[in-house]
Amino acid sequence: MTEAAPDAPAGGEVRPFREPGRVPSRKSSRLVTLGVTGDWAFAAGTLLLALRRHNPDPGAHILVFHDDGLRPSDRGLLESLGARCEPFSAACDGLRPEAVRLLSPLSLAKFACFRLLADYESVLWLDTDIVVQDSLDEIWQCGPLALAVEDPEFTGEGRTCGAAVNFYEPVPGVDGDAPNLNTGVMVWRRGLRDPEALERRCLDFLQAHGPKLRYPDQAALNALAQWMRAERPDDLAELPRRFNCHPRSPAAVYAPVVHAFGAYKLWNDGLTAACFPEWQRDYARWQRLGGSAYAGPVDNAAYGEGGAFYLLRGLFDTIGKSEQALKALKERLAAESAGRKKLEDLLRRLQPRL
């Protein structure tokens, strides 16, 4: 169902997560993975900027899977931020057209994380509609396979959806009433038994039930987790919700990871964007570095008029005007200082006469 492109080795050397020009001191035992289509390169770049700031020395490599729509300039910028970019082909045969429209094909790249355990002690997957707000040191200890129960604040009713939300119709052997597991943040850790067999189980599930799947990656991983809960409970762990917190949750203010799953993202909804100015600052930095911008529509833009959301549409001008104002202020202060010095010199010359 999915496979890495022939020139994209699944477990090869990847560029260390470090400041540009800094030579890594050792081979890392940790890997951060992302998957991005070309039109979402801005989201990956913004995420990496936050990851770097809050985790300046995480001892992790970064691997960004991408489709053939990634611009060379964006790829170069992602690599300058410490990532290795690898092409990934996702076969969506058998899925409904509406499911293909709903999902990012690169979300299927997360299944490759099972086999990446052959080269790393821990592998972390992050969807790109995420804000990193704090250190991720604690997340690496989760596992052997860890994923979070969907944040109940997402529904607005204080309840978690059932796993049935991932399906167009029931699938035998899958409990649709079980709490839905969100797969936007996942951890794989060495000690997980037969990881490649688990990957194959997920891919076989996609192949067997494709037309029934609304959110294919999440459907397959929920089915896998239900099987593991019965057959291998020691291999399955619940990821603490603070590592997969929805923006609607009051806990999002302090959560290390905020995940804007659902229709409203940090870049297409003014209300959501206004709540996370840190994401906007990083997004503006990405563009200042030469990265591509979000090109789609924005809902609820009025919430941000004149406020934080203005950064998304006009931060370049704002920064430029601020720099000009600071320059003018410095020049005025210098002129005032020169004038004051002249006045002081004049007073000193007049002092003996007074």
Region roles according to the model:
Residues 44, 107, 111, 130, ...:
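Conserved glycosyltransferase catalytic-site signature
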Residues 68-74:
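Short, charged/polar "capping" segments at the starts of alpha-helices
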Residues 74, 80-116:
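Active-site-proximal specificity loops/subdomain of glycosyltransferases
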Residues 50-58:
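Short, acidic, metal-binding catalytic loop of nucleotide-sugar glycosyltransferases
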Residues 61-68:
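Short internal beta-strands
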Residues 2-36, 46, 64, 190, ...:
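A glycosyltransferase accessory/donor-loop signature
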Residues 87-91, 108-159, 187:
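GT-A fold catalytic core of metal-dependent nucleotide-sugar glycosyltransferases
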Residues 141-204:
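Conserved catalytic core of nucleotide-sugar-dependent glycosyltransferases
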